[in-house]
Amino acid sequence: MSDTDGKKPLGLGGGSRSGQVKQSFSHGRTKSVLVETKRKRVVVPKPGASGSSTTTSSPSHLGDPAKRPAGISDAEMERRLAALRAAKLREVDDAKRRAEEERQREEERQRRREELEAKEREERERAEALRQKAEDEERARREAEEAARRAEEAKRAPAPAPAAAQPDAADSRASAPTSAKPGLPPSRKEREREADRDRTTKKDDSRRSGKLTLNEALSGEGGRTRSLAAMKREQEKARQKAMGFGHKAEKQVRDVQLPETIVVQELANRMAERAADVVKALMKMGMMVTMNQSIDADTAELVIEEFGHRAVRVSDADVEHVIDTVEDKAEDLQPRPPIITIMGHVDHGKTSLLDAIRKTSVVSGEAGGITQHIGAYQVKTESGAVLTFLDTPGHAAFTSMRARGAQVTDIVVLVVAADDAVMPQTVEAIKHAKAAKVPMIVAINKIDKPDADPNKVRTDLLQHEVIVEKMSGDVLDVEVSAKTGLGLDELLENIALQAELLDLRANPKRAAQGAVIEAKLDVGRGPVATVLVQHGTLKRGDIFVVGQQWGKVRALVNDKGERVDEAGPSVPVEVLGLNGTPEAGDVLNVVETEAQAREIADYREKAARDKRAAAGAATTLEQLMAKAKADADVAELPVVIKADVQGSAEAIVQALEKVGNEEVRVRVLHYGVGAITETDIGLAEASQAAVIGFNVRANASARQAANQKSVEIRYYSVIYDLVDDVKKAASGLLKAEVREHFIGYARIQEVFRITGVGNVAGCLVTEGVARRSAGVRLLRDNVVIHEGTLKTLKRFKDEVKEVQSGQECGMAFERYEDIRAGDVIEIFEREEVERKLA
């Protein structure tokens, strides 16, 4: 016999029974619906199955050597059993934990359910109270109206006759229903109507469920039903109506932050009002604006008050309040190194003096032997004192650099050459030091020269109110020689003494703040700023904002070129990690987040842009026309400036602004820091300008573009060479000066009329010489009546080039014939002389 004997064959069918019913809808539509009845298969375990499974999973069975899998030792079996026991314990713990969590969740759900029920119960009671109150008021009002109406009718109408009530009774009897007879059972039609009414009620009740039942599908009823959502909406509307009957929702009063200018749409959003309503309110005030236009703060405040809100004035400058302005406590202040700025006239030996102190040679690396950058160095003296030195340029073009050096310094060392005395930049340095209110030490340099006269220096300083100690003043003065090292120790001692008197202290634990001494765009490192830390400690990773730029400190490099992790007060460092090149003189502040730094930088950039737009905008049409007319009369020399550092670029721009007069001027189209790029060439080509590179070069693409577009690129490393060349180029735009030289006079003796030529004057040259190419003026009674040129000059019948004094000749004027005997002809020549800018 086969194993399959007595068993039915397997198949996919028979799992469920199906049939079709037809569902009817309104308007004669039908739909066939498939109805399935699924059968469930119940599996009953065989007797003894549970016992065998228990036996199989028992440890004794696993530990039985006879039934143990082959190749498993006792130790391995013990480990497996321990793992099983640990797993069972974990399962028990997990089950307990899940049960506890479920219990807590159930308690939380129960608590929330009770709170919700209590809230709903309070709302129902409140709604019921409001509804009852409204009904009582309405009933009282109706009763009062009915009583008043009856009293009014009683006053107007006479008492009715008793017989008048008879027809009313008859009418009431006639209007009574006649279908039902008292005491008789209902008829068949009445029973059918009652059944229809019950069926309709049941049908309406089932429509709330929103589901199609099998009975409805078979009976064809309940085709188009009302949705459950519609019923919920109606119930919610009725509930809200009952709760808010006779009460208007209270308007929420908001505090609206109001900047200096705001767009109408944004104002509406902050008030949570419709923009159309705000526009309508502004139109009532006489302002025809759209929702995308801006309005001023005063107008917006009136609108806010009209809508019942409160205006809170805020300024765009509030974003800068996040900058830390902590007042340092006395116990947190620690001594810091003094900052000494070396200032003086060009070539008076400032950098050489600093080289002698540092025992280095910086001046040999400067172009032209003059300092064109501001340098910051730290020097440790033999006594162990640390001094921070700032070396400033002495050239006249670097006024702003010297001013920046004086603003951040503690002590100014004024270097004056003993053989040159006080010069213009020396006077300027004195003014900067006095404006910054910092003490001054005079270093009389080049004392080793034979023609040195230190007393002349001291006497010249008296004219500028600088009185040294040797002349009974309070300003220290030291005679030094940077070449031989004479007097350097005394100078350092005086600096240390002055620093002790100042008692310089700072808090190194606060957020860092410093001043940008110099900034540049390095090819390999990007924007780099030389920062002198004034307060706090600047660390790697700090987020900072400086002027219109922001960044994160990627690296700190000290004056020796070494990378450091932090820089304390009075320490100069190069900061890497800026998103752009800042302006020299900007203040660096450390902030908490990158978002704050970006927001402050964006605000400062917008403020600077608005300031430039306001400065360049003409207020009236007359001013605009006058400016255009003035510009038309002035010749311009456009240039594009690129420099290695920000301070040099500023100095070049300031120097070029002074070049020119009322006829010609230099126009700087753009100045920046870094190499000359293709963008600079495109700008210069569009404006017919020259590109000037100061200690920078053009990249390959820029050089190629310059050759293609015929744009001139000039390179310089010394600023006064640059200024001299630009001055020469601007001088070429000046109109040449015309000078007249009188070469002779002739008197008209007689006038002849010649056919084809016109009037010809027979003249006698009384003085000088008469030339054919010269200009002439006709004088009558010493009054000039004509100025022009000669058409012909003849002696006898020959055309000649010139006629000497005392000889007679014939002259005819070009396009002029009103000549008379006795008139005087003045003969002159014009010469054009090139002009130069002073």
Swiss-Prot record:
Binding site for GTP: 344-351, 391-395, 445-448
UniProt keyword Endoplasmic reticulum present: no
Segments of skewed composition (Polar residues): 18-27
Biased composition (Low complexity): 50-60, 162-177
Region (Disordered): 1-235
Any one of the GO CC terms: cytosol
Compositionally biased spans, kind Basic and acidic residues: 88-156, 187-208
Annotated protein name in UniProt: Translation initiation factor IF-2
Organism of origin: Cereibacter sphaeroides (strain ATCC 17025 / ATH 2.4.3) (Rhodobacter sphaeroides)
Gene name of this polypeptide: infB
